[in-house]
Curated annotation (Swiss-Prot):
Source organism superkingdom: Bacteria
Originating species: Chromobacterium violaceum (strain ATCC 12472 / DSM 30191 / JCM 1249 / CCUG 213 / NBRC 12614 / NCIMB 9131 / NCTC 9757 / MK)
Gene designation per UniProt: proB
Pathway: Amino-acid biosynthesis; L-proline biosynthesis; L-glutamate 5-semialdehyde from L-glutamate: step 1/2
Entries under InterPro entries matching the protein: AceGlu_kinase-like_sf (IPR036393), Asp/Glu/Uridylate_kinase (IPR001048), G5K_ProB (IPR041739), Glu/AcGlu_kinase (IPR001057), Glu_5kinase (IPR011529), Glu_5kinase/COase_Synthase (IPR005715), Glutamate_5-kinase_CS (IPR019797), PUA (IPR002478)
Stated name of the protein: Glutamate 5-kinase
Length: 372
């Protein structure tokens, strides 16, 4: 097995908190210098690199003299604001040693959920890469709330991979890669060298392995790889403790776990529908509707909906689930939740009688839906 990084021209590298901080107590400047050197080597080989880096909150806590990470949202946001200054300064200094410029990009889920802002972010990042700049991306913790948070930088890394249509995502952690079970609890766990990113068995294997410094366990990395695969990107989960890990991956050396994309690349708008929108509710489908969407990619008609969950407006994103609760698709609805409850199980010709008007014959048109 050879690493896919060797043949990848555009790469997103996510570096976890434990790899850039002193056990969560401020930034490890030597570690940042090392990552700058590694990325500079990839750049020397002609690769475009985006770096997704944690560390702002840990640095903020250090600067504010807090020995214990706070639990309050506003205290965490304050720490992020203070720490982001240090993170930017440290990376700017580290990359300057290799003749490279950096750019700071702070994102929230809301930025990518809005189609116009999504396209603007893609254009900006593409321009920076073409200017030979290294974009350094982090979640905008200072303003992010639970409704607009990505939740972890593994997810952010995958969404950025989709956004810029990168060839590969490298998730560097303090673990060797993916095992059949948590090796810290199961010494006989088998190491997984390669698998398909969409293999559902991976989620069962992932468990909750993860360091105490960041917010992401191994399960978030599996889900990130699944998201990245929708744009055709492979994911490598590897230990950031490995010497010269990025250079060796670029040489083709098999390090860590490689999760390959087994499905065809989704169209850009379908990727946006699949991963960048917050879900406002759920539609429960009957067996016929679920089968039609899975096998033929049809639009969803009201007659195929057996129940409506949540409160949503026209144009918001909802999940479509089958009788077993498995997500079949997600899409943008043509009717609000109140309207949907009035027209569910009804044929198209009965919509006007139920509502007094008809907006569209479909509850979700196939052009605004992505099958999962």
């Amino acid at each position: 097995m050879h690493s896919v990084i060797h043949a990848s021209d555009r790469i997103v590298v996510k570096v976890g908190s434990s790899l850039v901080t002193n056990d969560g107590r401020g930034l490890d400047l030597n570690a940042l210098a090392r990552w700058a050197e590694e990325v500079a080597e990839l750049k020397r080989r002609g690769k475009q690199v985006v770096l997704v880096s944690s560390g702002a909150i840990a640095e903020g806590c250090q600067r504010l003299g807090w020995t214990v990470r706070p639990k309050g949202v506003h205290e965490l946001q304050a720490a992020a604001a203070v720490g982001q200054m240090g993170l930017c300064q440290a990376y700017e200094s580290a990359f300057r040693s290799f003749g490279l410029r950096t750019a700071q990009i702070l994102l929230t889920h809301e930025d990518l959920a809005d189609r116009t802002r999504y396209l603007n972010a893609r254009s900006t990042l593409t321009s920076l890469l073409n200017l030979n700049v290294v974009p350094i991306i982090n979640e905008n913790d200072t303003v992010a709330t639970s409704e607009i948070r990505f939740g972890d930088n593994d997810t952010l890394g995958a969404l950025v991979t989709n956004l810029i249509e990168a060839d590969a995502l490298v998730i560097l952690t303090d673990q060797r890669g993916l095992y059949s079970a948590d090796p810290r609890k199961h010494p006989d766990a088998e190491f997984i060298h390669q698998a398909e990113a969409g293999d559902e068995r991976l989620e069962d294997m992932a468990g909750g392995a993860g360091s105490s410094v960041g917010t992401g366990g191994m399960i978030t990395k599996i889900l990130a790889a699944k998201r990245a695969a929708r744009s055709g990107a492979a994911t490598v989960i590897a230990s950031g403790r490995e010497p010269h890990v990025l250079s060796r991956l670029a040489d083709g050396e098999a390090i860590g776990t490689q999760l390959v994309a087994a499905t065809n690349r989704m169209a850009a708008r379908k990727q946006w529908l699949a991963d960048h929108l917050k879900l406002a509710g759920r539609l429960l489908l009957d067996d016929g509707a679920a089968l039609a969407i899975r096998e033929r990619g049809t639009s969803l008609l009201p007659v195929g909906v057996s129940a409506v969950e949540g409160d949503f407006l026209r144009g918001e994103a909802v999940a479509c689930v089958d009788a077993a609760g498995h997500e079949v698709a997600r899409g943008l609805v043509n009717y609000s939740s109140d309207e949907a409850r009035q027209i569910m199980r009804k044929s198209t010709r009965e919509i006007e009688a139920a509502l007094g008007y008809i907006v569209e014959p479909e509850l979700i048109h196939r052009d605004n839906m992505v099958a999962l």
